[in-house]
Amino acid sequence: QARPETNISLEVFADDPTEMIRQARLIDSWGDEFNYDVYVKIPVMHYDGTPTTPIIAALAAEGIKLNVTAVFTFEQIDEIVDALDEKTPAIISIFAGRLRDIGIDAHYIFSHGADERTRTNKSLIKYLWASSREAYNFIDAQSAGADIITMTPDLIKKVNGFNKKEPKQFSLETCQMFIDDATKAG
């Protein structure tokens, strides 16, 4: 049975280029076998820091859908976009939460990615907001132009609560929690 709105990314667990390609082909075959829209997750670089763009280019040329992960820089986006095939769908996972942890606004990275997608006419590239830290990242990802966001179930629950509580009520509940915690502490 088809799952038209569902895709799944499965990561290779190797650093050797030949083994990464072998695993990627195997993972890709599971999509047909199990009728899933499978993307093969490839890290942006090897353990020693060398880019995986030759692997990305080879797999994309074979029509294997990729999710290139652990992306943090403009240069990485440029290299990935140039390596991707215009006929093969791909996801570029930008670790927005971790960028913010070091004081960098991820909006600039996403804006650059959108510009690169337009410049190269590679419309099948989607950008993923990874490493969400708080529920409001859902809004951040939308305003940054992310096509996809990953969130934990706990964060999704909080997003589902958006606009369902007035700030004054939330303030009251927080103050009540302070007293309850103090009472429990003795």
Describe the residue ranges of each PLM region.
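Catalytic alpha/beta core domains of metabolic enzymes, predominantly
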Residues: 50, 67-157, 163-182
